[in-house]
From Swiss-Prot:
SUPFAM superfamilies: EF-hand (SSF47473), Metallo-dependent phosphatases (SSF56300)
Lineage of origin: Eukaryota, Metazoa, Ecdysozoa, Nematoda, Chromadorea
Major place of residence: membrane
Species of provenance: Caenorhabditis elegans
Record-given protein name: Serine/threonine-protein phosphatase with EF-hands pef-1
Record GO biological process: detection of stimulus involved in sensory perception
Cystine pairings recorded for this chain: none
Binding, Ca(2+) 2: 682, 684, 686, 693
Length: 707
């Protein structure tokens, strides 16, 4: 779908409101029923005509009357048989629908479990970094950091051991702005992408969008220009934005986009460009996971520059450099901008820290990315110096505090407020408790939502942060609304995207759903589900393969008779103990394991998929599987050390990262084996390891079946 200059006008015909679609479906169903009833009436009336004509010929004799009535009587419909057939068809349909729904839920559970397990790993890794930073600070006080700084990782971490940029550090900020100035970058003559000039206007933004549609890359000079201009606007805004719909009489809220540029185009095409009478709120997580994160970011920031009173951006948990290292945004920048990605990355860290953290609509609706906790207070959010939190994953350090106790108390309270509003999730249970599934933030129940809304005089809490199958979902007695705008989030056809429009003085919600895919209309629900299910099972098998050795040991312990098989129930208990993914393993067993002919046992010895790294044969299985299991963490470590975004790390950096990974996983890795693996990955033997080659070197292979 296009979203060029002409798409600024709203198109009411494309407003796919949920209520309208439901009414249309009901009307269509009633019309079909009336049509069937008319056919039945016509059939019965024609039968009556035949009966009357045949009876007029039966007055000649009683015998002929009886015989003719039996011969000429048309077969009358049998209501009982018709009803039974209809009931049987309904049962078949409902069973089929129930099976599809069960498969969909199991698939969804796999995707979410793997996603949240990755987020847990990321937060654990950052906790580990925090411990290292603390140790560095202690060593620094003793004057013994020289050895630590020789380590590539220690050198990278030294940047994060310093406090975040503050207004009082004017020279530091000034130098950063000078180093990232667009005037430092020249435009090559061969550049054929979109061009921009200040002041920006909607036609320029429209041309930029059209260029992005055909995969043209915006020149880094223009990227830096947009970031600098957007930074000025965000810096002047309060931590909590407040907007009024008295003029527009409506407001549109969009959830996570995660680099899905096609979804952003659909939103602008269906709903029009932001304007005074068509304001927008984009509720965080603009980047990561999708392949066009920088394009999404440039369009949103450009729209803010054009009309800052018509579009409001809230910060999400992925507007964070540490998250970007793991989930793809830094990799995307390195691929598209090579060496020039370094100043862009440095400036983005600062710009993200200036994004507002929440928005209030007419003192009635509270909009925040993640959610709330029992400690969340708007008055505290208003006063938070948000720019101190370049990463929300750790509390900032302020050297200006008089005592360490005062420093800890003040910063931790502010940090907890920030962490909760960006990482929390609603639950049906009452109360508030730590969000252990994600590893950060809180779970909050309906009572917490009700208390927060009543305390602040709000009617509704709108948040994002969670992928929903339909693109949105109400919870907590319709007082908490989740909106997620990235369609096909896990896989093509996995979910719809949606946005919500609050219209009128009563601000009634109207939902617009969509799916940015050209193929989903041509395939059936069963076919789409099959594709998504296949993708989920493939990822789950890869995850299980990374636990192969641990699983086999556990299976052998439980297999007292050494038969090479286990009952499905025992097998599922073993898998859950080792992986901790909290999945319906009994239902998933036929898809991820080999079963006996009667389907009662899992033949665990026939699991032949093992992890392999590089081409070396002298491998220690425990080391290889540990590296494979934590390959995302290893990639994060590499990108953390790759300060110049060259995409390469030295052998020393590789060995250092693996040793750090061993400390992080509390399973020390032997240097000899790490060196063998490193040599096998260094295909051109230049002493450097390319990150892309490293990730390609991780693979699953089928081992020979032992007889």
């Amino acid at each position: 779908m296009g979203c060029g200059p002409s798409s600024g006008r709203q198109n009411p015909s494309t407003e796919l409101k949920k209520s309208t679609r439901a009414t249309t479906t009901t009307t269509s169903s009633s019309q079909r029923n009336n049509y069937n009833d008319n056919n039945q009436n016509t059939s019965s009336s024609s039968g009556n005509k035949k009966e009357s004509s045949s009876s007029s010929k039966q007055h000649s004799s009683k015998k002929s009357k009886k015989s003719n009535s039996k011969k000429n009587r048309s077969p009358s419909p049998q209501p009982q048989l018709t009803i039974k057939s209809a009931i049987l068809i309904q049962k078949w349909y409902r069973r089929c629908e129930a099976r599809l729904e069960a498969r969909r839920r199991a698939t969804w559970q796999i995707f979410t479990a793997l996603e949240y397990a990755g987020e847990q790993d990321q937060l654990k890794l950052y906790d580990f970094f925090a411990d290292v930073i603390r140790a560095m600070a202690e060593e620094n006080g003793k004057g013994g950091v020289e050895n630590g700084r020789n380590s590539p990782l220690m050198s990278a971490l030294s940047h994060y051991a310093k406090p975040s940029l503050m207004d009082s550090e004017g020279e530091t900020v000034k130098k950063m702005l000078e180093d990232t100035s667009p005037t430092n970058v020249d435009i090559d003559r061969n550049y054929k992408g979109p061009t921009l000039s200040l002041p920006l206007d909607k036609p320029q933004v429209a041309k930029m969008i059209e260029a992005f549609k055909v995969n043209k890359v915006l020149h880094p000079k223009y990227v830096l220009m947009i970031l600098h201009e957007a930074r000025k606007i965000f810096k002047a805004m309060p931590s909590v934005s407040r907007i009024s719909t008295s003029i527009s009489n409506q407001v549109t809220i969009c959830g996570d986009l995660h680099g899905k540029f096609d979804d952003l185009c659909i939103i602008l095409y269906k709903n029009g460009y932001p304007s005074v009478d068509n304001p927008y709120i984009f509720n965080g997580d603009f980047v990561d996971r999708g392949g066009q994160s920088i394009e999404v970011l440039c369009v949103l920031f450009a729209l803010v520059i054009v009309d800052p009173m018509s579009i409001y951006l809230n910060r999400g948990n992925h507007e964070d450099h540490i998250m970007n290292l793991r989930y793809g945004f830094i990799k995307e920048l390195s691929t598209k901008y090579k060496d020039l990605s370094t100043p862009i990355t440095r400036l983005l860290e600062d710009v993200f820290s200036w994004l507002p953290i929440a928005t209030i609509i007419d003192r009635d609706i509270f909009v925040v990315h993640g959610g709330i906790s029992d400690q969340t207070e708007v008055s505290k959010l208003d006063k938070i110096p948000r720019h101190r939190f370049q990463s929300v994953l750790r509390p900032p350090v302020n050297k200006g505090m008089e005592s360490e106790k005062e420093n800890s108390a003040v910063n931790v309270d502010e940090w907890k407020q920030m962490l909760d509003i960006m990482w929390s999730d609603p639950k049906q249970n009452k109360g508030c408790w730590p969000n252990v599934f994600r590893g950060g933030g809180s779970y909050f129940g309906a009572d917490i939502t009700a208390s927060f809304l009543e305390k602040h005089g709000f009617r509704l809490l709108v948040r994002s942060h969670e992928c929903k199958f339909e693109g949105y979902e109400f919870s907590h007695n319709n007082t908490c609304l989740t909106v997620f705008s990235a369609s096909n989030y896990y896989e093509t056809g996995s979910n719809r995207g949606a946005y919500v429009k609050f219209i009128g003085k009563s601000k009634q919600p109207h939902f617009v759903q969509y799916m940015a895919s050209k193929t989903h209309r041509k395939s059936t629900l069963r076919e789409r589900l099959g594709v998504v299910e296949e993708s989920a099972v493939k990822e789950l098998k890869e995850k299980l393969s990374s636990f192969h050795t641990d699983l086999q040991k556990e299976f052998e312990i439980m297999d007292i008779e050494k038969s090479g098989k286990l009952p499905i129930l025992k097998w599922s208990d073993c898998v859950e103990r080792i992986t901790g993914l909290n999945l319906p393993w009994i239902a998933l067993a036929p898809k991820v394991a080999t079963l006996s002919e009667d389907g009662k046992y899992v033949m665990y010895k026939e699991d032949r998929r093992i992890a392999q790294v590089g081409g070396t044969h002298a491998q220690e299985k425990d080391i290889v599987e540990s590296l494979y299991r934590h390959k995302s963490t290893l990639e994060t470590l590499f990108r953390f050390m790759d300060k110049d975004n060259s995409g390469q790390v030295s052998m020393k950096e590789f060995i250092d990262a693996c040793e750090v990974l061993g400390k992080y996983t509390k399973r020390p890795l032997q240097t000899d084996y790490i060196s063998q693996i490193a040599e096998s990955i260094d295909f051109n033997k230049d002493g450097f390891i390319d990150l892309n080659e490293l990730l390609e070197a991780f693979r699953l292979v089928d081992r020979p079946l032992l007889r």
